[in-house]
Amino acid sequence: MHYIAGTELRMPVQIRRADQHMAMFSVDADAAQAMIADSGLEVCRVRPGRAVVVLTFMHYIDGDLGRYYEYATNVMVNPPGSTRSGLSALQSAGAFCHHMPVDQAFTLEAGRTIWGYPKVMADFTVRPGRQFGFDVSIDGQLVVSMEFRPGVPVPSAFTSKTQEHPTYSHLDGVTRETLGKMALSGVRYRLGGVRMRLGDHPYARELASLGLPKRALVTSSARNVEMTFDDAREIA
């Protein structure tokens, strides 16, 4: 149990409704490793010299942390102690949350306090519709702008099963692992499918160091996401 801004949060934290847009990219593994070096974790090398970065936009609609927007830069990493590589290694990999701007103070405090997520306050401009888009800016500087083209619907039988995956974070010198569960519905996928523009914020320069913007491997959207988050565990 945690108390955030005078509100009691019982674990696991529940997200009952959210929608998601995601873009997956192949990036230079050494550049990705340099970006997360302080964490002590190792990027998952899916091919020689290549790693995977996933950029996500979430609109949390109904959950214990309230209603808010969130952008995240996630680097896929091996579990601590693992040296697996190749595409099959992604099955056990977790998402290291490197950037995580949000637009509400409560989720910012909860994220940083409970899980060590690097949440910072940001401004979002959201363009709903068949071709979904958003901009995220911090202190008046654009981080990234993304425009998604709709994908092909995927039957819920393939996506609605609850999945459990770890996420990792590094904040104030501490690396943490958090186990979470997720179930998706209303999912669409497509190859490519996103147009992105980087701004002049330091986060944007980090994304540029990975070779972005470039064509995405795959993009997806989910009309509804249900999630739970356990307490974090310090691992380094």
Regions found by a protein language model. Give the residues of each.
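Detector for methionine-enriched segments
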Residues: 1, 11, 22-24, 35, ...
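Aromatic-enriched hydrophobic runs in primary sequence
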Residues: 29, 51-55, 68-69, 73, ...
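Interaction-surface and assembly-scaffold signal
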Residues: 1-6, 105-236
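Alpha-helical protein-protein interaction elements
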Residues: 17, 49-52, 60, 88-90, ...
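Generic alpha-helix signal with a bias toward terminal, lower-confidence helices
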Residues: 34-39, 48, 67-69, 87, ...
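Generic detector of short, locally flexible boundary/turn motifs and exposed helical patches
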Residues: 20-23, 37-43, 87-91, 97-103, ...
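N-terminal domain-onset segments
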Residues: 1-64, 68, 80, 203, ...
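Aromatic- and glycine-enriched beta-alpha-beta binding-site module
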Residues: 58-143
